[in-house]
Amino acid sequence: PKSTAAFDTTSILIDEALDRLESTYARVFGGINPDYPNLIRSAGTMAMEIIANSDALYHNVEHSIMVAMVGQEILRGKYLSEGSVTAREWVHFIVSLLCHDIGYVKGICPGDTATVAVINAQGETVALPAGCTGAFLTPYHVERGKLFVFNRFKDHPVISAKVIARNIEHTRFPVPEEGDSPDDSDF
């Protein structure tokens, strides 16, 4: 029988990107924490499949993959020049990059509905205008991304939701003036 499945370029793109992320980890760290490449793949697959449902024109799978690939090269350069990146830090950084714009996707946070999006940890919401895209969530996407990772990774035995959320917070733009310090002790 003939297959009725359509040619799915998004799945191919996701698989190829995750192959690269896994293989770069293996090239850098060898057999250290051999389960970590699978963590990258499983968290990355989850994030990319969710982001693939986004209707925001720019903050999509392609953008998230490009951010992860460039971020990985920056991290690899830091590792090669300083040697100061652990395998655990690597995994958290890559997962953070893959999840950094997940807050643009409608329906991902507990309490989201077809007409309302949760915008912070206090459960405040914003009404979604009829016909809006995920780009409407721009002012809230960092908080929503943090809510998502706290919900998704809260009980994970290896991935720290707190670390991922802190990294997502570092993507906020413009950079907040109040309380912001030039802390360069993390990624």
Each model region followed by its residue ranges:
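Histidine/acidic-rich helix-loop-helix segments that form or flank divalent-metal centers
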Residues: I94, Y140-F187
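Active-site flanking loop/helix segments enriched in acidic
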Residues: S42-M69, A127-A135
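Non-catalytic interface/linker regions that flank or bridge core catalytic/transmembrane domains
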Residues: P1-A56
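Divalent-cation-assisted or electrostatically stabilized phosphate/pyrophosphate-binding catalytic cores
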Residues: V116-E143
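Amphipathic, well-packed alpha-helical segments that form the structural scaffold of globular domains
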Residues: M48, A68-R76, K146, F150
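"Short basic amphipathic alpha-helical interaction patches in structured regions
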Residues: T86, I108-V118
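Alpha-helical phosphate/pyrophosphate-handling elements in metalloenzyme active cores
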Residues: N53-H92
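His-Asp-centered metal-binding catalytic motifs of divalent-metal-dependent phosphohydrolases/nucleases
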Residues: V67, W90-C109, G145, R166-P174
